[in-house]
Amino acid sequence: ALPIFDDPHFIGLGEVGLDGFEPGLDQHKAERVLLEELKIARDLDLPLSIHVRRTASKTLGLLRRVYGSPGKTGFQPVRGAVHAFNGSDAEREAFLSFGLVLGFGGACTYDGSKRIRRHLSELADGAWVLETDAPDMPPASRRDAFALGQSTLDTRPADILEAARTAAQLRGTTLAAAAASARAAAIAAFPRLEILLRLPESFGQQTE
């Protein structure tokens, strides 16, 4: 195994995936690359962070090629998360059937993100995680502050708290309960996170 696999900071493979929104991308090449990345993750039992932007059908097809079809002989469950999920109900259930969890970040804090917010309100505990995608996907408060010239749009890891508050509100629970649910789901999807969360802040820092 490569030495990097022994580093507790290495918790999975990603972000990998397909993007059907950005113009000029070689989609055939992207699919070939993702296919090989999925094979690496399967063979090395690595969790995945998967980018899916207007490419759910193609992504699900590649997952079936590599991991098999859920409920069928030979199927291997997939660990990891679908980053910034914004798909249909059918796509939601399809990704969950593989064993993946769905990620929600800054977009869930916007009142206009109706479908995203509904997904987050309906999903069972253990099926969703929180993320920031720093420095992208700013939460609503940062966007509003930016409009007033009081902040940048650069998202920071601490902004996950705003997503957690939104999750609690949408799910009708407390902030502590929502945070605990998201934390447990994240550790289940990326088991080495539990090791990383126990490390002292000074771990890995170079000394003068």
Question: Where are the regions a protein language model picked out?
Answer:
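Catalytic pocket-lining loop regions of alpha/beta-barrel enzymes
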Residues: I11, Q27-V129, A188, L196-G204
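Active-site mouth loops of central-metabolism enzymes
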Residues: G20-H28
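Short, glycine/acidic-enriched loop or turn micro-motifs at the edges of active sites
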Residues: L18, R54, N86, A134-D136
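Short acidic/histidine-rich active-site segments
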Residues: G126-F146, L153, A178
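Residue-level signal for inorganic ion chemistry
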Residues: E15, A41, H83, D133, ...
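Intrinsically disordered, low-complexity Ser/Thr- and acidic-rich flexible linkers and loops
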Residues: G68-Q76, S141-Q150
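Mid-to-C-terminal alpha-helical segments outside catalytic/metal-binding sites
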Residues: I40, D154-E208
